[in-house]
Amino acid sequence: MFNRTLTTILGIICLLTFCFADEKFSSFRELKKISNGMSIIHTSDSKVGIVAIHGFYPAYWIGIHHEWVQPFNYLVKNEINTFFYKYDWNDCPSSVAEDFNVELNDLIDKHPNIDQWQVVGHSMGGTVVLFSILNSEFNENIIYNTVATALHMDIDKVPMTTRMSIEKRFEKCPDNLNSFDGAFSKGFKNKLVQWRNIKEFDSQFKKYDFDPYDKEIKNSIVVQFPDSLNGERVGHTSSLYFAILEIVN
């Protein structure tokens, strides 16, 4: 496993891009209307393609896909081929990954002009990425990315407010985060980059009595975000935008 830390250059890039964002999408509502499956956000003559995978949304969550608005606007402005894979987040990530792999292979076949693919899964979308890469053939043109994604779950140390829902999901999905130990120790055939937050600054995990990021995946690259960049807290949602900036630049 290789560890990297971000430099102040990323902070400067972030400051500039916040000021000059292209507003193709003004609201999460536009993304919410997109059907499940693989959808085109933007196409261009670029040789790079970004494939986005969203995470889990609780029943009470209003701003579904809000975290993707700013990254998508940035990618569109910079003429990057961008695709969005949507799915039913109540399904098991392992099952979702099976469909995703079919869709990804079809997408690659349809866009032979793209010679570098970046698959980016945020939060539970990163779990889908892990199951995807687990069952993927080697392809040197694909880099898999997990952003703000837990690598293991100690259910007994999760706050009671969320413990029951996690227990139900794990009972429903025997192939879950805690199924990867053997795979993590061996590593994956394809390149994997983990974009990790500091647990105490991640709204999703800060109340956990353990660090869900604290797990080694052999031969993966780890990018550890600081607690803030240019005064902007790097949290569970904002880390997605920072990761996209670094991937593109």
Predicted ranges, named:
Residues 2-22:
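Classical Sec-dependent N-terminal signal peptides that target proteins to the secretory pathway
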Residues 21-115:
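Active-site catalytic motif of lipid deacylating hydrolases and related acyltransferases
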Residues 51, 83, 145, 193-196:
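Hydrophobic/aromatic beta-strand patches that form the interior of the parallel beta-sheet core
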Residues 58, 97-189:
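Serine-dependent carboxylesterase/thioesterase catalytic core
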Residues 64-65, 153-160, 203-209:
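Short aromatic-enriched loop/helix-cap "lid" or pocket-rim segments at secondary-structure transitions
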Residues 67-71, 136-138, 161-164, 211-213:
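Glycine-rich, phosphate-binding/catalytic loops in enzymes
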Residues 85-89, 149, 197:
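Active-site loop/turn elements of alpha/beta-hydrolase fold enzymes
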Residues 167-171, 175-249:
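C-terminal catalytic-base region of ester-bond hydrolases, centering on the histidine
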